[in-house]
């Protein structure tokens, strides 16, 4: 039987997509990425700088529940 690992799949969401009006976006919606994180090493929420296709620029993506 397999052990339960320390790695969990998390979703990262763009922080700027919610505040920018739809007229300034390339397409409607919110940018989201999925990734894995090690629960033992990073107990706090992830915050990475990723490319947002809706805004066509690099933005901060934060972990959501």
From Swiss-Prot:
Please indicate if the UniProt record lists Ribosomal protein as a keyword.
yes
Q: What InterPro entries has UniProt attached to this entry?
A: Ribosomal_bL33, Ribosomal_bL33_CS, Ribosomal_bL33_sf, Ribosomal_zn-bd
An example of a Gene Ontology cellular component annotation for this protein is: ribonucleoprotein complex
Fetch the Pfam families from UniProt.
Ribosomal_L33
Q: GO biological process: any one?
A: translation
Q: What keywords are assigned to this protein?
A: Ribonucleoprotein, Ribosomal protein
Q: Ribosomal protein as a keyword?
A: yes
* SUPFAM superfamilies (UniProt xref): Zn-binding ribosomal proteins
Q: Where is this region: Disordered?
A: 20-40
A molecular function (GO) held by this record is: structural constituent of ribosome
Q: Which family does it belong to?
A: Belongs to the bacterial ribosomal protein bL33 family.
What HAMAP family is this protein classified in?
Ribosomal_bL33 (MF_00294)
The name of this protein is: Large ribosomal subunit protein bL33
From what organism does this protein derive?
Prochlorococcus marinus (strain MIT 9211)
Lineage of the organism: Bacteria, Bacillati, Cyanobacteriota, Cyanophyceae, Synechococcales
Quote the gene name from the UniProt entry: rpmG
